[in-house]
C-alpha cells in the first residue's frame, strides 16, 4: 500500500509538473493566479483590461528577470531594452508566446462577452475652473469685450496728448515695431475690466491720412516760395563799338530794356507754372558781336570787339523790333566773329569777358584757314 501510494504521488507530480515555458506562462497569466475568479481581468475600479498580446506576455517574464538582476534600473529603460530584444527575436522564438496570447484572448472573450475596447479618455482640465471668476470668460466670447474693443490709432508727432487722454486714468502702453514700423497705443487691460483689442486702420483711413500729408506738404512748399525773395536779374547794356553806340536805334533799344527792368519784370524759375501761365514774358537772348572797326588799333577797341551784346528783352504782348537783322524775336540769334584769335590776348583790362588765348600760332592759322578741302578725295586715307 505504501509503494502504491508512492507511485501515485510520482505520477501526479509528473503530470502536474509543467514545462519551464508553460510554467512561466501559467505563472504570469491571470488564470494561473485565480482561475475561479470571474474578475481576473478587472481593476479595482471595475475597468476591464484588454487581454495581453504576445509581446506583453514575453515582456512580463523578461521584466521580472531584469528587475531581479538590477532592481535600481528605471522602468522606462527596461521597456526600451525589452522592445529592442523583442525585435531581435526570430519568428520561431515568438511562436509559444503567440499561442499563450491567443489562449488568453479566448478566455477573455468567454469571461467578458459584452466587452468592447473603449480607450479611456483623459479628463480635460477646465481652464476656467482655475482662473478667478472675473477672468473666467474669454475676451473673444464675451459681448462686453467686443463692444469695449478700442481702436488703436497710429501715433503722430502731435498726437501724444490725445492718446494719453483717450486712455483715461489707465496708463497707455506704447509699442514700437522693431523694423521701423508705426507706433500703436494699447489701453491698459485693468481699466474697468475691459480687454484691450487692437483694430488696425482701414485702407481708406490710411489713404485719407496720406492725402492730408500731401496737402500739408504742398501748403508748406507754397509758403516757402512766397517767403523766398524773388531774384531780380539786372540786365545791363553792354557797350558796343563806337560806331554802333552812336546810332539812334541802339540807344533806343537800350532805353527800352532799362525801362523793362525798372518796371519790375522778373524771371521766375517755377517749373510748374511755365506751361500754365501764358503771360510770362519771353526771353530774347541776342548775342551780337560788334564788327571790327577798320581804322581803330587801340587796346580799348580790341576790348570792345571781344564784348558780346547780351540783352534780355522781356515782352508781354508785342515782340520787340528785330535787332541786327534778327529774323525771329523769340529765337536765339548767334553770329560768328570773323576775326583773328590772336587779338584776344591784347588789351585785357580785367574784364570778365576777356579770356586768355591758349592757342599756338600754328593752331590759329589752321583755324583761320579753310576747314574743308575742295576735293573729298583728299580726305580719304590710303594705306
Curated annotation (Swiss-Prot):
Cytoplasm listed as a keyword: no
Classification via Gene3D superfamilies: High mobility group box domain (1.10.30.10)
One BP annotation, GO: nervous system development
Region (Disordered) location: 1-24, 115-174, 197-231
DNA-binding region: 48-116
Low complexity composition-biased segments: 158-169
Entry's Gene Ontology molecular function annotations: DNA binding; DNA-binding transcription factor activity, RNA polymerase II-specific; sequence-specific DNA binding
Polar residues biased stretches: 1-11
Subunit structure: Interacts with nlk.
Protein name: Transcription factor Sox-11
Source organism (scientific name): Xenopus tropicalis (Western clawed frog)
Gene for this chain: sox11
